[in-house]
């Protein structure tokens, strides 16, 4: 046993390798080149190992194992390049007490990782089950809301003209004293005007055509807005003749419609048209709110005339109670009085001087 070496002598240039077939026949041998005995590892690094330390060293530094005639073995390396014929049949390799091919185990790990990634993408692991339920619920509510809006839009065209054109209500206004007066303009509810009527880019406004719902007659109005402290009031101008011909009175309702082609229509309803009490109250509340915000608009012709007159006077004439103006006029009067001739001379002042003097007799 002392002279035993598990590899052939130094003169041997080849070694017989056992080749296994699927039927476990060991009758076939192949010859492969081998190393010189000077290049071979000592026998205590080859199996069987004498001590666990030597076995661990062999695992950390794997070397090819060669067969002897007495103990035929299969050469094994970590890469498995010398026994490629056995890679395709790992079960046979396990039966012999060997290890699996590292390449196959690596591919198996990669396949498992890919499968886990696919499952994570399908189940969205970043979201909890409650979040998934909430997202699905929100999506369902959004779809339901869109369907309701579409159905409401279709159902909003409930009225029609005599030529069967579908109409929907854009704006409704209960006429006030200022709307049917001689000012020739009708104030529209701000909320309805901004939401439904054409958009206005400047104060000049646009010209709109409106057709009577009950006839073929059309009217042309100037649709514009007035600004006041970051707020707006929307009006229809050039309505004087329109009010007269339609016999509009205080308390009547002007309703503006729109057809499916975005054409505008109107209808003038008298006091008998107040059948829907809810709509009437809502319209009154809106009108009261608009008039309260923009209180500077006159309510009748007399107030409008007075406001216009006061504005013109303030722009072109000084305020009578201004002390600076009174002081200036008094100095001018004193200067003209000191330059007048004595009483024994007959001097007739100009009409301007007389007026200026009379103005300050009370001073």
Swiss-Prot record:
Keywords: DNA-binding, Nucleus, Transcription, Transcription regulation. GO terms for molecular function: DNA binding; DNA-binding transcription factor activity. Residues 171-272 bind DNA. Gene3D superfamilies: DNA-binding pseudobarrel domain (2.40.330.10). Signal peptide: none annotated. Disruption phenotype: Pigmented seeds. Distorted seedlings with elongated hypocotyl and curled cotyledons. Presence of trichomes and accumulation of anthocyanins on cotyledons. Unusual pattern of storage product accumulation in seedlings. One of its GO terms (cellular component) is nucleus. Residues 1-27, 331-351 are annotated as: Disordered. Its main location: nucleus. One of its GO terms (biological process) is seed maturation. SMART domains: B3 (SM01019). PROSITE patterns: B3. Transcription regulator that plays a central role in embryo development. Required for the maintenance of suspensor morphology, specification of cotyledon identity, progression through the maturation phase and suppression of premature germination. Ectopic expression is sufficient to promote somatic embryogenesis. This is B3 domain-containing transcription factor LEC2. It comes from Arabidopsis thaliana.
């Amino acid at each position: 046993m002392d002279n035993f070496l598990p590899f052939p002598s130094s003169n041997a240039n080849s070694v017989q390798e056992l080749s296994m077939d699927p039927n476990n026949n060991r009758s076939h041998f192949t010859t492969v080149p081998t190393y010189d005995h000077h290049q071979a590892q000592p026998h205590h690094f080859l199996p069987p190992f004498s001590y666990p330390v030597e076995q661990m060293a062999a695992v950390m530094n794997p070397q090819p194992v060669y067969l002897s005639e007495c103990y035929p073995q299969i050469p094994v390396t970590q890469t498995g390049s010398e026994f490629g014929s056995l890679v395709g049949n790992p079960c046979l390799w396990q039966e012999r007490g060997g290890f699996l091919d590292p390449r196959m185990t690596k591919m198996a790990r990669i396949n498992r990782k890919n499968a886990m990634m696919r499952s994570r993408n399908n189940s969205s692991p970043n979201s909890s089950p409650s979040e998934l339920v909430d997202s699905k619920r929100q999506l369902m509510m959004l779809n339901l809301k869109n369907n309701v809006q579409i159905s409401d839009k279709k159902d909003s065209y409930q009225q029609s003209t005599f030529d069967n054109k579908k109409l929907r209500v854009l704006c409704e206004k209960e006429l006030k004293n200022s709307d049917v007066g001689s000012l020739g303009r009708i104030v529209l509810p701000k909320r309805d005007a901004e939401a439904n009527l054409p958009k206005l880019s400047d104060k000049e406004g646009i010209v709109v055509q409106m057709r009577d719902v009950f006839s073929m007659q059309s009217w042309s109005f100037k649709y514009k807005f007035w600004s006041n402290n970051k707020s707006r009031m929307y009006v229809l101008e050039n309505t004087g003749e329109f009010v007269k011909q339609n016999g509009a009175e205080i308390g009547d309702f002007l309703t503006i419609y729109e057809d499916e082609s975005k054409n505008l229509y109107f209808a003038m309803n008298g006091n008998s048209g107040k059948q829907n009490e809810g709509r009437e109250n809502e319209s009154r509340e809106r009108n009261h709110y608009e008039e309260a915000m923009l209180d500077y608009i006159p309510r009748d012709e007399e107030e409008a005339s007075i406001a216009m007159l006061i504005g013109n006077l303030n722009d072109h004439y000084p305020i009578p109670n201004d002390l600076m103006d009174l002081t200036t006029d008094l100095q001018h009067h004193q200067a003209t009085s000191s330059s007048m001739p004595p009483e024994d001379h007959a001097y007739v002042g100009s009409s301007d001087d007389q007026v200026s003097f009379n103005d300050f007799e009370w001073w």
